Structure formats: structure tokens, C-alpha cells
Amino acid sequence: MSVEMVSDSTFQKSVIDASQEKLVVVEFSTKEKLNKRGEPNASAKMDSVIDGLDAQYAGEIEFFRVEVNLVWDYSDPQKPMAKDDLNPAASSAYEINHGPTLVFLLEGERVQENLLGFYDEASTRQKLDELLKDLNSRLLKIKLFRFIEEQINLAAQRVITKKSAQLDDIAYGKLGVFLGLRRTLQNDTTAQDIGMLDAMNDSLQCLGVLGKGETILERIK
């Protein structure tokens, strides 16, 4: 699988949407891949590294590539600026003035300073592993929210499509539990939610899933 190439017109749908669920790395790579000596330049080398990492981090990190053509503007000799004429909106948004540059996004926001220049595979992998470790709690919470939303939709659908006049207690129970968890994680807890969570904590502690005195919210967060 090759790294998806995106442009100004597809950046929002491809990159920003993907970053709502997992860490996204965007490589801004120069269109020109050779240096003046006719050898692979830094962008060409970084392309190869990112292509390899794309397979290694499948499911954990989503990689994208944006081609840039940087033209230097010397209208102000004291503050020359590099401007991209291929995908100026994305390049401007992330202050790209060098290729290659890596941008790291989660939930549509940068989670680390841009990484400029070429890094070999081992160095890049080390930086990615450190970032994943730093973002671990946040990534787990995103996965949990997605799971909760899926369970809410499944339970609600089962309640709605129930053909029997008898209430589906299991579906209603699941719906109540997951709605309560969602409200709690969104800091909109009700008294009923607190009672439900206390009961869940007691049960999970008895089963050994949680340690003595530990709560499900502590485990989640």
C-alpha cells in the first residue's frame, strides 16, 4: 500500500477527518526529487522512509504526502519567504518553507513541532514511538469514544427495531450504560450516572478487572 497523495482540495476530507481517530503524519515533499548533481534529494530519501513506515505502523498512524514547489520571494530582502505554488493553502496553514517537512496531527491539531529535513528510518521510528507514547492516554480515549458511540447506535437500533411489545431489557441496559459513560467522559454526569459507575466499579473490582479502590474512569483516563 502506497502513501496517499493529497492536495489542497482533498486535505480536509482525507487528512483532518483521519486525524479524528488516529495520529496522522503529513509529509510535505518537494516535487523535484533530484539535487543539482542528479542524485536523490532529501525529499526523495524521506519519501522512501515514509513509504516503509506506512506499512510498519498500519492501524496506528495514517501517513499522507503533499507535494510542494517552493519559490522564494525576495520582495523584502530582509525577510525572504518560501511560497508553495502547488498546494499553497496547506503549505501556508502549516508554515512550510522547507522540503521535506513532517507535520503531526491529532483531532485536527498539531501535537508536535514540525520536523524539517531528512531523517533515516531508525531516527524517524524513534520519534514516532516517543510521540505515540506521549499521546497514549489521548488515543485510548478517542478509541473508547468511538467504541461507546458504536455501542449506543447498536443498542438504540435494537430498541427501535424490536418487534415484540416486550421491552428488550438488555438493549435498554446497554443503552443506559453507554450513554452514562459518554456523559461522564464529556463532563456532563448525572446523579444516576454516578450511581451506575459506582456499581460498575464494585463489580469490576470483585472480578479482579480493577484493582482495589481503582475506578473505571481512572483506567480510561
Residue ranges of predicted features:
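Short active-site neighborhood of thiol/selenol oxidoreductases, capturing the structured segment around
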Residues: A18-G38
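N-terminal interaction modules that seed assembly of large macromolecular complexes
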Residues: D169-N187
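A short beta-strand-turn-helix
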Residues: E4-V24
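Charged low-complexity stretches with an acidic bias
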Residues: V68-G99, T190-K221
